[in-house]
Amino acid sequence: METLVAGSIFMVLVSGVLAIIIYMLPWFIALMRGSKSTVGIFFASLLFNWSIIGWFITFIWSIAGETKKSAQPNQVIIIREKE
């Protein structure tokens, strides 16, 4: 009986952790991509991911949004040797 209870508690904890990871997946993607809108995606995820539509909107925002690297202008540095 104790094994059954311990196994049930373990499954509830694992399920809860997986649910949180899936719920916040758009924010994790934004963090990994270095998105400029990481804070906005975080709060939008907290508020709207309970609905499937909100989750898909934040997911698309996280994968299509501008990253910090792409926002910087391209710079070319030319170094010449002295003759």
UniProtKB/Swiss-Prot annotation:
Cytoplasmic face residues: 66-83
GO CC terms of this entry: host cell plasma membrane; membrane
Any Pfam family matching the protein: Imm_superinfect
The keyword Chaperone is assigned to this record: no
Keyword Membrane: yes
Keywords carried by this UniProt record: Host cell inner membrane, Host cell membrane, Host membrane, Host-virus interaction, Membrane, Superinfection exclusion, Transmembrane, Transmembrane helix
InterPro entries cross-referenced by the UniProt entry: Phage_imm (IPR016410)
Function, in words: Inhibits of the DNA ejection of T4 into the host cytoplasm. By this means, T4 excludes superinfection by the phages of the same family.
Name of the protein: Immunity protein
High-level lineage: Viruses, Duplodnaviria, Heunggongvirae, Uroviricota, Caudoviricetes
